[in-house]
Amino acid sequence: MSKRVRSSLILPAVCGLGLAAVLLSSCSSKAPQQPARQAGISGPGDYSRPHRDGAPWWDVDVSRIPDAVPMPHNGSVKANPYTVLGKTYYPMNDARAYRMVGTASWYGTKFHGQATANGETYDLYGMTAAHKTLPLPSYVRVTNLDNGKSVIVRVNDRGPFYSDRVIDLSFAAAKKLGYAETGTARVKVEGIDPVQWWAQRGRPAPMVLAQPKQAVAQAPAATQTQAVAMAQPIETYTPPPAQHAAAVLPVQIDSKKNASLPADGLYLQVGAFANPDAAELLKAKLSGVTAAPVFISSVVRNQQILHRVRLGPIGSADEVSRTQDSIRVANLGQPTLVRPD
């Protein structure tokens, strides 16, 4: 299972405690009963979330759980840039051409029933997955390279935040792939085009209506532009503590990056990161959308090095406004005026 899933299978402990009959049934030699679905998720009615993650103590025959069915998504997808512990991720808007080989993990009881990153409810017996940069929702085929088994899952969550993991699957998906007991597996992840998937089966793709949007037709043109520009700011996403990535090691401040800049003119700051790589990535992206000089200014705050991504000097307030609009429309953050230091 994932590094955030550190507990071993907890079934023996449950059997020893002799709790409710529904739990004891998992320990008996008789075939386990299917759990009743409560509030849209699987599991017993008296489910109580454990403090540590692990496998469920109620059993379901995962061979009878169908794979996720790829559905076209005609509304907006969740692909906002977001920051985890100082590192900013820039999700893609289209998963259809995605291909990756790497390590998969899984997550279970601790997150069962909790909201996912796109607001859905995590069901450990659902066919879903978490990914750092795929759009939410999207669909991928995951193949276990050790045994050739494959599943289709719906990506609706963010994670895992460890450099050696490419995807986190639900417990059911991991069990169908044959690695729930070992915790991880080497997999191939392939994006799916839902329209093509349905066409290969000789059927038209179902029509999924987008969510209604608030009308802005009567709003002044400037207001409409601002509404579009501010639609997708960089998010600060705080995952559960068990998912946190390793802390960034202290680094030396590069004096060349902090070379003195002209004091005249106006300056914007778009982000501040503990991770210097995240700052460099944002700097590179900003350089592609604005003609204003982009630089990194590193300072120490509360015994931590922060790498601030800034623009300037900018000659006028009008130019500042245009630059801010360009950055917002590109979904690269919310630039704010700062004093040069």
Curated annotation (Swiss-Prot):
Entry membrane topology: Lipid-anchor
Entry EC number(s): 4.2.2.-
One cellular component term from this protein's GO annotations in UniProt: plasma membrane
The UniProt record lists the keyword S-adenosyl-L-methionine: no
Domain SPOR: 260-341
Entries under Pfam families matching the protein: DPBB_1 (PF03330), SPOR (PF05036)
CDD domains assigned to the protein according to its UniProt record, in alphabetical order: DPBB_RlpA-like (cd22268)
Keywords attached to this entry: Cell membrane, Cell wall biogenesis/degradation, Lipoprotein, Lyase, Membrane, Palmitate, Signal
Superkingdom per UniProt: Bacteria
Extent of the signal sequence: 1-26
Single annotated GO MF: peptidoglycan binding
InterPro entries membership: RlpA (IPR034718), RlpA-like_DPBB (IPR009009), RlpA-like_sf (IPR036908), RplA (IPR012997), SPOR-like_dom (IPR007730), SPOR-like_sf (IPR036680)
Domain note: The SPOR domain is important for normal localization, but not for cell division or rod shape.
UniProt record similarity statement: Belongs to the RlpA family.
Name of the protein in question: Endolytic peptidoglycan transglycosylase RlpA
Source organism of this protein record: Pseudomonas aeruginosa (strain UCBPP-PA14)
